[in-house]
Amino acid sequence: MRYQQWRLMLLRSYHRSHLPYLSPCSQVTSISSRSFSSFIHPGIGALQQSEQLCPLRSPMTSSGNLVKSVGRSFSSEPAVEEKSSAEATVIDIFSRLSGEDEIRKELESSGVVISQDLALKVLRKLESNPDVAKSFFQWIKEASPEELSSKNYNMMLRILGGNGLVDEFWGLVDVMKKKGHGLSANVRDKVGDKFQKDGLESDLLRLRKLFTSDCLDNSAENVCDRVCKIVMKEEWGDDVEKRVRDLNVEFKSDLVKMIVERLDVEPRKALLFFRWIDESDLFKHDEKTYNAMARVLGKEKFLDRFQNIVVEMRSAGYEVEIETYVRVSTRFCQTKLIKEAVDLFEIAMAGSSSSNNPTPHCFCLLLKKIVTAKILDMDLFSRAVKVYTKNGNALTDSLLKSVLKSLRSVDRVEQSNELLKEMKRGGYVPSGDMQSMIASSLSRKGKKDEADEFVDFMESSGNNLDDKAMASLVEGYCDSGNLDEALVCFEKMVGNTGVSYADYSFEKLVLAYCNKNQVRDAYKLLSAQVTKNQLKPRHSTYKSLVTNLLTKKIARDGGFEEALSLLPIMKDHGFPPFIDPFMSYFSSTGKSTEALGFLKAMTSNNFPYISVVLRVFETMMKSARHSEAQDLLSLCPNYIRNNPDVLELFNTMKPNESAVEKPLAASA
């Protein structure tokens, strides 16, 4: 028989793995290098019936330690935060919402998949909140009844009984019994104490009788315990098979699934049981049990056997369940088996049931793992995008944003264009905001060639970079100190779209020139853009440039005259004059002739503002520059020299009274 053949191979493998001395070679389990992505395509060869098993070094860790929600899958964040986040998210959703569709959409958008383990953790946290617990339990019961195990039922009984909901407690007991689940001692003790405290003697007696009968019956939980004890205790053989048969139990899907999952710590024995029960005609495997076996074998050491089970399951017309995908792909990514994770993604996406297809969040997490791998394999990226979009799914800005963030985290921003090209083949066109983000990240990192390639790529796609994206290029080059390239991009932007939205990027350009001590070049740039392209700089741009032109060294070399020439341009653009830097200049080094030039620049209808005149004189005299103030007064026209306010200022701020800031001025 075929069963006898694979059993002998399994046992032979087991004996070899328990020899006292092993060669280094015998301790290494070979991992098939073949891809099983072809399983989803027609023309697949006949299913291999024999299982090639290799020696095992140690039992596998319990699957209970694996992540149960999509939000945890592939994540590079700390595990503790993710686990608590999934439970908190579920509790928040069921505390706020009541509609089935609302809840389903919220769970999907949060990237949470309800599994048996996650359901149990949520119920434990809701022990003192029976209303939300009932809502949550009822929703799972209707939406995913297969995710309710004996432990889940017992936890719900504990909540109902512990909160005095006696009728609902007994109602759930009846439902639970029909499903073959038994009452746990923990529930008996907890609820029994509550019944006794509330004086519910008849209910207490009924509870005790129920537990006694459960200990003697063939509930799924009890049968599972007995089968697992037999299988785990001894080496597999005729005696083990006979003892399991002698239990005289009817094996149903939930029971077989439970046993296989319980044997997770011994994957080899789980597979022996799985094969034997089918070959012995005790049970015909279905989608539920195949997936349970796949979850147990979905580990690096059992890769070949996992692949065989998946092929067999698909050939039988069954699909990879979402929980299987999440658990196994998580393990694959944790052990750097990125190619195998993509293979599994292709198979899971090929399923006809949308509820079993990996979610957009799953897809995003897989792409993030691909781009942060030791070597970025664009073929894997392309395969994942292709199979995802083939199912009618759309690629989004939020997806690309998340993937690019991961790409930057491993300092591969220069490969952004490669990702973008692959996504374009999937029908994706980046929005203006995404264009800006990509342009900024490339130029800030000084990746000129890649930035040029990005611009060319967008133009060849018939989608020229919009003004915001071009501005981001300019800003990025400014931040990286590449002023020449920043200027080229700015002029290209103005040539393509005009100056309507160029004011912010122009300010960045001016500031970058100033920071590079090229202030006068910034002035020339502003003058040229205003004259040639009718650019209207921001008021803040004028302020920054004027302030920098009036620094001591630059002002002496012609900066003062240039700053002065900006005042009428500011006025033409509707901005008030910015005179504070001029006052600072006159208080220290400004000459009387320069002050007169400033007053002329501030003249309106042939008369300067008297308030400005008074401020200039006062600034000079407060700084003990009385001689410069007198020289300026002598250069002013009569209407200023004879102005009462001016005369009063000079009378009250005589040298011996006004030299408060510079005592040495008293000797001037």
Swiss-Prot record:
Pfam families given in the database record: PPR
Transit peptide feature, positions: 1-36
Cellular component, GO annotation: mitochondrion; ribonucleoprotein complex; ribosome
Domain of life of the native organism: Eukaryota
Any one biological process term the GO annotation gives: RNA splicing
InterPro entries: BIR6-like (IPR044578), Pentatricopeptide_rpt (IPR002885), TPR-like_helical_dom_sf (IPR011990)
GO molecular function, one term: mRNA binding
Family: Belongs to the PPR family. P subfamily.
Name of this chain's protein: Small ribosomal subunit protein mS81 (rPPR8)
Species this protein is from: Arabidopsis thaliana (Mouse-ear cress)
Taxonomic path: Eukaryota, Viridiplantae, Streptophyta, Embryophyta, Tracheophyta
